[in-house]
Amino acid sequence: MSNLAYQPEKQQRHAISPEKKVIVKKRASITLGEKVLLVLFAAAVLSVSLLIVSKAYAAYQTNIEVQKLEEQISSENKQIGDLEKSVADLSKPQRIMDIAKKNGLNLKDKKVKNIQE
């Protein structure tokens, strides 16, 4: 006996679709080319820094040498001044006359000519 009016309920099947897994590729935050450029830039900055420091040190050493030479020049100038003063003291006419009289020389006023420099 078949009942044509009878239709069995069909079970609703929920089709479980397989979830698509999205694979997210993690990119490096910095690419290899950027890393190379960064390293080259850091090396350039380091090189320039070392160059600047070395030039500053050379200038410092030169300044020290200049100061030493200036001190030496000033001491030489002082010594020259002292020697000029002693030359002036030793060449005074009165001193020369005293030494001449001490050694037995006589001054004859008629034969003496006074020469001024």
UniProtKB/Swiss-Prot annotation:
Biological processes, Gene Ontology terms: FtsZ-dependent cytokinesis
Q: Which family does it belong to?
A: Belongs to the FtsL family.
Localization (cell) = Cell membrane
Q: Tell me the function of this protein.
A: Essential cell division protein that may play a structural role. Probably involved in the regulation of the timing of cell division. Also required for sporulation.
State the phenotype upon gene disruption.
Essential, it cannot be deleted.
Factors inducing expression: Transcribed at a low constant level in all growth phases. Part of the mraZ-rsmH-ftsL-pbpB operon.
Q: Give the GO cellular component terms, alphabetically.
A: cell division site; plasma membrane
Write out the topological domains of type Extracellular. 57-117
Subunit details for this protein? Monomer. Interacts with DivIB and DivIC. Interaction with DivIC stabilizes FtsL against RasP cleavage.
Entry comment on modification after translation: Cleaved by RasP. Cleavage is important for turnover and function of FtsL.
Membrane topology annotation: Single-pass type II membrane protein
Write down what this protein is called. Cell division protein FtsL
**Which keywords does the record carry?**
Cell cycle, Cell division, Cell membrane, Membrane, Transmembrane, Transmembrane helix
In this entry, the parts of the chain located on the Cytoplasmic side of the membrane are 1-35
Under InterPro entries, the record lists: Cell_div_FtsL
